[in-house]
Amino acid sequence: MKFLAPMLGLAAVFTPFAQATRHTQSYSFEPENAKTVWKGDIPILFNLNETQAGSWGGSYWITSYVTTTENEQYFLVSHVLTTPSVSLFRASRLNLGNLEYAQFVEVGNLTSDRDSLDLKIGQHGFQALSDDNLSKTRAFSKHKNVNFDLTYEATTQALPNAGSGRFQFGPGTTWEWALPSCKTDGHLVKANGAKATIDPKKSFTWYDRQGGDNPQTPGNWTWFQLHVPSTSYKLSIWTIDDEKTGQFNRFATVRGDGEELQVLPVTFKPDYTRTFQSHASSKIVYPLDWDLVVAGFGSFRISSVKADQEMVGTSSLETAYEGFVTYTGRVGGKKVDGFGIVEIFSKQSYFE
């Protein structure tokens, strides 16, 4: 999802699916059905539709929580990053039943339309299917490891990060907004090569759009996307550490009913009892559990369901941990159990 520092390169890195212990829990992936994406009562600093155009560059990113017509559940990640100097596509697939995992990263030439959302790197990309660049969008990946073709609709109220949609990010600023629960259909190809149809009544996509006025990024960050079942709450939680700029930020943007937004400080503590050693760098060890307190809102104990959920590249630009997580916690004094994603980005010096 994230806006990363540009680096030169041409590479394709992938791993085949891996077997793991079967995970029997099922999840409620019902999409929202909002009538409008953004009413405009809160004055954000950009037009959502305009930022979709290829000329804006930056990051186009989705996580899709899907249920097939055979009642199998998958977690899909898809990401196009475009900067003046480099472009990449990466994707992953996690079977939430048996925890089979596959991923790839491809750095190469981007073809795009300056005035609309139409981005392609190799056989993968994002494409607007509506004139407004927003109402209906396609994400597709044709790699042998991760193959899917998804259509997602803007049936959800937007979430502009930090309330206005813009915040400090390294030495510059970044803008970021999300459509957190889009109706989704299409198909994916399973590990055995069989094609599976997605049930749109039991599937949704979080679409995240980000760019900025400075290509530099913080040294490290951990970002969480959390969904609170049986409520309208969607959380985007940033924890940013950048020693060069002295930026150590922890904040959550909470979207509730309608355009209800809260921007709240966060207490963040990674737990290194369980860890995963990066495939990309011997200097990177990922924690697999975290304790978070969102001030005035709730507390969460978050855990990755599978240790190896790393998208493996050859640099910090290409590599990220994009893991499906579950959590237990309390919101409004009530016990909650939910799911989401953790994204972990490590600084370039770990690859040198």
Model-derived features: positions:
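Structured soluble/peripheral alpha/beta segments that form catalytic or ligand/cofactor-binding pockets
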Residues: 21-352
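Fungal secretory targeting signals
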Residues: 1-20
